Amino acid sequence: MKKITRRSVLKVAAATFTAPFVWKLHAHAAPSETVLHASFGASGMAGSDIGSLTASKNLKLVAVAEVDDARVGDIKKKFPDCVIYKDFRKLLDTEKKLDSVNVSTPDHMHGPIAMRAMNRGLNVYGQKPLTQTIHEARRLTEVAAEKKLVTQMGIQIHSARKHKLVVKLIQDGVIGKVKEVHSWSGKSWGDTAAKPAKNDAVPAGLDWDLWLGVASERPFIAGNYYHPGNWRKRLEFGTGTFGDMGCHILDPVFNAIGVGNPSSIRSELPGPNEYNWSLDVQVKYVFPGSKFTTDTVALTWYNGNARPPKEVVAHIGNLKLDGQGSILIGTEGVMYSQYDSGGQPILLGADKFKDFKMPEMANDNHYLQYVEAVRGTGKTSAPFSYSGPLTEMVLLGCLATRFPKTDLTWDTKALKFTNNDKANAFVKKEYRKGFEVEGL
């Protein structure tokens, strides 16, 4: 942000007039200003995020932190004035005029980088999953609220018409009270093999120590074992298919039924090995009910080769089971939400749906929402106040896969399992010396 204008001060004062005793100036850019932005990550999902954010004429990319020189070529071509760093800490220490950042790195660095940025008062667009641990998600949610920062998690479906239709139809009671949900993804971000006993040369231009970040030291393994494309499979760096796709596919469900965190979780299939997430996952959550559900509601997640049982799939009749999606079973009908295909949810199981007319709803631009919210002219639809608890719920399922055939009872207020101390050891993790983060 270039300066704080009288207009921005008046805007904040008006918005906070009813707050008790004191108010403080937000770090938002005034509507007349350009948002000065930095990206953590330069290619892959980071490149996509950069392209979508800079599509706004009101945001300027001024800096990028990327540990691998081989991944900054496009940035140099498209943004010749952008300053490129390798160390995210140096970027945050050097770039004093920033308003905003996106965190689009491997999962294990989402929380640490986002928290360092937030400690500086910067607004954050954070890729899903918001963090790699439940503790990190809770702390980012808390700090975003304390500092009144603009935040958005990168779950673009949240702003899509078909997502919004799921939420509206469920909350309007179109299928009655939701009693059961089954959601799945055919992706298989896992590995049953042991880690290769290799110590390969680090490629020129890659800072392996910075890539590891908060994780423990280990040799580099060539052949795309970790970097750039398979870190999602590894326990210390990714969150498997569940963490990768759960935040997308469970988002409409979580948003629609409004149940918060589960009271219990159980994983039914073999767990991860010492190094890698499982290929196939089946996890059942039980939630206390909400006004949109029966007294309790069960949600089962499947990924890899796991799928809902035949009696559940029978609800959609002759329709093809999508590669990714959800079936929501209500007291007065069924909703089939397709993630990979289909423009709107399909209503089944009742004659009243034959002539049902879908409400008029439009797609929103998830990225533009964020940019305009930073400028003070709008608000985000997936701020950390929403996406933090969503991430916690997803990560609880990831954690549960470590304890197959075990009923885990969760106390969300205390942020711990009440019946399994071994599981509690995975709620929070220690960071490597030199990468500690205040607040985490």
Predicted regions and their residues:
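Beta-loop-alpha module in the N-terminal Rossmann-like domain of NAD(P)-dependent dehydrogenases
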Residues: C82-R139
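Contiguous beta-strand/loop segments that form the cofactor/metal-binding neighborhood of enzyme cores
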Residues: K164-L165, K177, H182-I346, A350-S385, ...
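N-terminal secretory signal peptides and thylakoid transit peptides that target proteins
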Residues: M1-T16
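Loop/turn elements at helix/coil->beta-strand transitions in domains of secreted/extracellular proteins
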Residues: E33-V35, L59-K60, P80-D81, K97-S100, ...
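N-terminal Rossmann-like dinucleotide-binding module
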Residues: A13-F79, I157-A160, I170, V253
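Short, solvent-exposed turn/loop segments enriched in Gly/Ser/Thr/Pro and often Arg
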Residues: D68, S104-M109, L130-Q132, A137, ...
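A contiguous active-site-proximal alpha/beta segment in oxidoreductase catalytic domains
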Residues: N123, T131-L210
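Hydrophobic residues in well-ordered beta-strands that form the structural core
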Residues: S39, V103, G126, T151-M153, ...
